[in-house]
Amino acid sequence: MLLALSQWIAEDIRAFNVFSYITLRTMLAALTALSISFLIGPAMIRSLTARKVGQSVRNDGPQSHLIKAGTPTMGGTLILTAVIVTTLLWADLSNRYIWVVSLTTLGFGAIGWVDDYRKVIQRNSKGLSASSKFFWQSIIALLVAVYLAMTADLPQHTEMIVPFFKEVAIPLGTFLFIVLTYLVIVGTSNAVNLTDGLDGLAIMPTVMISGALAIFAYVAGHAVFAKYLGIPHIPNAGELAVFCGALTGAGLAFLWFNTYPAEVFMGDVGALALGAALGVITVIVRQEIVLVIMGGVFVMEALSVMIQVASYKLFGQRVFRMAPLHHHYELKGWKENQVVVRFWIITLILVLIGLSTLKLR
């Protein structure tokens, strides 16, 4: 929107051509989303509190969590509002990737919103059934996967890139590309949701990974940089850096309210949407393996749940004191802030390793 306006003004005032630079618009998007979140955040939290949109707490969890009961949830609507409004303002709205990512984010956010609404507004403790959630997640993810497969311009746009090796890629073909895309989007969405169990635990890794994906998107969309770094050139993917900038800014602002002791939780509306956004951006810029590296905390959290369930069903024993993994460490005696900050540190290290794959080939 503002890009189109600046291009129109630039016909008379050439200085406005500066807004055509993706790097500038990415920074402005981060600042805009940050500002929007800070402006409307307090009012939204007050509204959620007044409506008694409070979080329920598991009785079988750490006893320290009982004080969290009643804390406003569905704060993910704040993040989504800031991200989408900012994207509409600063991104090139003729770019199809912007719409793919935005609509995917909103779609998964809608699933999470319905789940949260049923749990906290209608007082239905089960919320949206697991099968219903999985069904709608699958529908959206498959639609996105098929669309990306059908619109892939070159064979390398559907290859799996192997990091740390120069020009090593695994041809997937249409079917395997669709399967991989589906797994990445649905898997990342649910992994972020599982991680969102402590104050600030999920949002900061999301911010760090989003910032890294902004760099991957920018270089993938730049023919010269992509060739130099030995990664696939994805025309027009650079515009996704603007979306990532908005997500980074909105996420940092949300952390202001979500840090311990949290004033608001993001709820499924935020966690499912943010995970899906990271997943679909990763697929577009062809960095699925790198996402597994950078999102190691999300991977560990999801695996801990799968291992716990499988072990109990098969052998009647639990591997962890409690799943997801962050609760295991709490029950071992770690304070909540210790778990959160240590997981942040792990994510920072993994993100730096992920970024190093751009050069270490």
Swiss-Prot record:
It is a multi-pass membrane protein. It catalyses: UDP-N-acetyl-alpha-D-muramoyl-L-alanyl-gamma-D-glutamyl-meso-2,6-diaminopimeloyl-D-alanyl-D-alanine + di-trans,octa-cis-undecaprenyl phosphate = di-trans,octa-cis-undecaprenyl diphospho-N-acetyl-alpha-D-muramoyl-L-alanyl-D-glutamyl-meso-2,6-diaminopimeloyl-D-alanyl-D-alanine + UMP. Pfam families: Glycos_transf_4 (PF00953), MraY_sig1 (PF10555). Its cofactor is Mg(2+). This is Phospho-N-acetylmuramoyl-pentapeptide-transferase. HAMAP family: MraY (MF_00038). The chain crosses the membrane at residues 28-48, 73-93, 97-117, 134-154, 168-188, 200-220, 237-257, 264-284, 289-309, 338-358. Keywords: Cell cycle, Cell division, Cell inner membrane, Cell membrane, Cell shape, Cell wall biogenesis/degradation, Magnesium, Membrane, Metal-binding, Peptidoglycan synthesis, Transferase, Transmembrane, Transmembrane helix. The lineage of its organism: Bacteria, Pseudomonadati, Pseudomonadota, Betaproteobacteria, Nitrosomonadales. The gene is mraY. The keyword Cell cycle applies.
